[in-house]
């Protein structure tokens, strides 16, 4: 199940994200938070010590029983900019970010694993007919 906290003026159909959440974590709640560029910068600075805005952050809650799987925080203005730059829809960009974030909630880590997150992202991207993943874009 997907719970959405949209803190931006962005209007979008989140049906695709609900489908993705049901595939990746069918019995768990995932919180999606859409924030401004400045809010993302504050979160990144305060929680990770990185004083810049990023596109997506994930915060798992696995240590706390009977809570959501975690939160995926997406920088909506940056997603919109990237969608325009890359020539695909905002919904597709948010879906890519959401997949990336949820995989982190599930324990995948592209900086440490041996391609497992990239492989899983690729499978989901094909299944949902989405453009290139974040990991693939970063390597190009």
UniProtKB/Swiss-Prot annotation:
EC number in record: 3.1.-.-
InterPro entries assigned to the protein according to its UniProt record, in alphabetical order: MetalPrtase_cat_dom_sf_prd, YbeY, YbeY_CS
Localization: Cytoplasm
Binding site for Zn(2+): 100, 104, 110
GO cellular component: cytoplasm
Uppermost EC category: hydrolase
MF terms (GO), sorted A to Z: metalloendopeptidase activity; RNA endonuclease activity; zinc ion binding
Keywords: Cytoplasm, Endonuclease, Hydrolase, Metal-binding, Nuclease, Ribosome biogenesis, rRNA processing, Zinc
The protein's role, per its UniProt record: Single strand-specific metallo-endoribonuclease involved in late-stage 70S ribosome quality control and in maturation of the 3' terminus of the 16S rRNA.
Protein name in UniProt: Endoribonuclease YbeY
Organism: Helicobacter pylori (strain HPAG1)
Taxonomic classification: Bacteria, Pseudomonadati, Campylobacterota, Epsilonproteobacteria, Campylobacterales
């Amino acid at each position: 199940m997907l719970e959405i906290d949209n803190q931006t003026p962005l209007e979008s159909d989140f049906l695709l994200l609900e489908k993705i959440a049901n595939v990746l974590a069918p019995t768990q709640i995932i919180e999606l938070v859409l924030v401004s560029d400045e809010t993302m910068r504050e979160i990144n600075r305060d929680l990770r010590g990185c004083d810049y805005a990023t596109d997506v952050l994930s915060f798992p809650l696995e240590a706390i029983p009977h809570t959501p799987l975690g939160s995926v925080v997406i920088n909506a203005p940056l997603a919109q900019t990237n969608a325009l730059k890359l020539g695909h829809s905002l919904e597709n960009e948010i879906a890519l970010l959401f997949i990336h974030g949820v995989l982190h909630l599930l324990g995948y880590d592209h900086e440490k694993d041996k391609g497992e997150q990239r492989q899983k992202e690729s499978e989901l991207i094909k299944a949902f007919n989405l453009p290139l993943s974040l990991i693939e874009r970063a390597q190009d």
